Regions:
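Conserved alpha/beta-hydrolase "acid-adjacent" motif
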Residues: 191, 195-201
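Conserved alpha/beta-hydrolase catalytic His-Asp/Glu region
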Residues: 121-174
């Protein structure tokens, strides 16, 4: 069972290394980079989902299960309109949109706009703030943040234009129509204490107890087991 692992904003594929010792034997995981991250050449910006699809097509085979975390989940969903669909899509810490109306938690449009302004002024400092922000819901937030910094370093492995494009996608992507009538089975998972998601988005997902937005740091073994379990269930569903 092939799993293609897709990371979120400002975080390259090294985030998935914590799961390497915990995958059950049928799973063949492969963590891939988005354009502009790691050694993957960046796309010219501004760019489109169609251009992203053209670049990512060799990395996203249809005979696999895609696993998209955070922005990676939003992008993977949007790509369903442009690429042959996978056997299934697992969304981790992602809903149909990034921003919420603020009535039941999550990140509001005003909060994201403030973050974008801060990023334009000081990209690296704002990225470091984001690492602290997304670690907040973990049971040991300081330890989760320490792990993030140790794994990712002092600066993002992505160029500033790529990161700015990612923030624009967080602002604008709306996958409600796609998720209402998807071309493949879709299963959702979320940390029970993920402060970046609204409570209504978390309630639509299989919740991982004692985890926030980064369950690969706080709950690597349970997360690997749940991803394998949900992928197996999704593969048994009619397409």
């Amino acid at each position: 069972m092939k799993l293609i692992l897709l990371s979120g904003w400002g975080v390259d594929r090294r985030i998935w290394q914590t799961l390497s010792e915990h995958w059950p034997s049928p799973v063949e995981p492969s963590a891939v980079e988005w354009p502009g991250y790691g050694e993957s050449p960046a796309l010219p910006t501004p760019t489109s989902i169609a251009a992203l699809a053209k670049r990512m097509a060799p990395e996203l085979p249809s005979d696999a299960v895609w696993v998209g975390w955070s922005l990676g989940g939003l992008l993977a969903t949007a790509l369903l309109d442009h690429l042959p669909p996978p056997k299934a899509l697992l969304l981790l810490g992602a809903g149909s949109r990034f921003c919420s109306d603020g009535k039941d938690g999550g990140v509001t449009h005003d909060e994201l706009a403030s973050f974008q302004r801060a990023f334009r002024r000081a990209p690296v400092a704002t990225w470091r703030h984001f690492l602290r922000w997304q670690a907040q819901g973990e049971p040991y937030a300081r330890e989760a943040h320490r792990q993030l910094r140790a794994r990712l370093g002092e600066a993002p492995h992505a160029d500033t234009d790529t990161l700015a494009q990612g923030l624009m996608w967080l602002e604008t992507l709306d996958n409600r129509a796609l998720l209402a009538s998807p071309p493949c089975p879709i299963h959702r998972l979320a940390g029970a204490h993920d402060s970046l998601l609204s409570s209504s988005t978390r309630q639509q997902a299989l919740q991982l107890e004692a985890a926030g937005h980064c369950p690969m740091l706080s709950q690597p073994a349970p997360l690997a087991a749940r991803l394998a379990e949900q992928a197996t269930r999704a593969l048994q569903e009619p397409r």
